[in-house]
Amino acid sequence: MAPTIRKSHPLLKIINVSFIDLPTPTNISSWWNFGSLLPVCLIAQIATGLFLAMHYTADTSLAFSSVAHICRDVNNGWLLRNLHANGASFFFICIYFHIGRGLYYGSYLYKETWNIGVILLLLVMATAFVGYVLPWGQMSFWGATVITNLLSAAPYIGSDLVQWIWGGFSVDNATLTRFFTFDFILLFIIAATSLIHLLFLHQTGSSNPTGLNSNLDKVSFHPYFSFKDLLGFIILLGALAILSTFAPNLLGDPDNFTPATPLSTPPHIKPEWYLLFAYAILRSILNKLGGVLALLLSIMVLFLMPITHTSKLRSLMFRPTAKAFFWALIANTIILTWIGGQPVEDPFISIGQIASGLYFLIFVLIIPTLGLLENKLLKI
């Protein structure tokens, strides 16, 4: 019998083992859909970003006007701009759900896949930050100034490092030009890193809600899960289209509709909503260097998850006390997001400090302690 082309062709064979004949646990829920929604978000960002880059001018005197020109004069330019801006928000919604699922069901025990995933999160955050600077509105300019200036907290090399990033003595034309370059190149670095993430995932196979070995109960990815993912694509793209057409500026900042000027500071400098939880942790530490370290650790703490997992059970499905603290962590992160968008005054300062302390406490102390306690109670 002639061999099936998808199993014999060198290129199609890779696609076949990754997306068609891939053995998949039958009991994975819709929480596993977010992993496949992320490449859709990435492709949408690259496609819209490419067309926007054709009309955008990375120059301080023209950047704001070029964005206005895209929205007013370019055919469907307003839609491209809105899809790109809101696409970033949907990207982060999918990322946070994907990480949340990984934490809940113990997916972090696939160490290589998890660590590459955390690196991907850092890359996506960096891309979102440099992309937010490009429209050159007030919040873009001051956000770039404040966040890049944090590097000056580094001992000895701090001020040199900041000037090296800026390309001068302040955020100016050189900064905007390099940020545009970074925004473009980082998307492709993310795409390459995603393939490595997928490669490591397919070495072990997917986990499942029970956290048990599922080798006895697997089906091929296509058609069962490919159609399930297709439903996710339709919902995601539909929601993105609705937001981008009916309420395109809902998640943006009004200050960014004012052209950047170094002569007046906005009343409250803050990043986009998806970075607010880390920004709140940064602000809750009164020392500059301490704040920068806390900001980095708020993401880096995810690297500790495979090390601090002390329970004999993988998934939180069978761990009621740990489950309660997982939801406490989610609530705490939402509180931090809210605090990051508030002015620096009481009671917001105190709430931010308590929430920041609790955030690290849950990751570093409470989760490993609960694992040991549950092992003892369950006698395993």
Curated annotation (Swiss-Prot):
Indicate whether Plastid appears among the record's keywords.
no
PROSITE patterns attached to this UniProt entry: CYTB_CTER, CYTB_NTER
Spell out the subcellular localization from the entry: Mitochondrion inner membrane
Its main localization is: mitochondrion
Residue sites binding heme b b562 per the record: 84
Q: Which UniProt keywords apply?
A: Electron transport, Heme, Iron, Membrane, Metal-binding, Mitochondrion, Mitochondrion inner membrane, Respiratory chain, Transmembrane, Transmembrane helix, Transport, Ubiquinone
Annotated residues that bind heme b b566 are located at 98, 197
Locate the residues binding a ubiquinone.
Answer: 202
Q: Which cofactors is this protein said to need?
A: heme b
Instruction: Report the membrane topology from the UniProt record.
Output: Multi-pass membrane protein
* GO terms classed as biological process: mitochondrial electron transport, ubiquinol to cytochrome c
Tell me more from the record. Answer: Heme 1 (or BL or b562) is low-potential and absorbs at about 562 nm, and heme 2 (or BH or b566) is high-potential and absorbs at about 566 nm.
Protein family membership: Belongs to the cytochrome b family.
Q: What is this protein called?
A: Cytochrome b
Question: Gene that codes for this?
Answer: mt-cyb
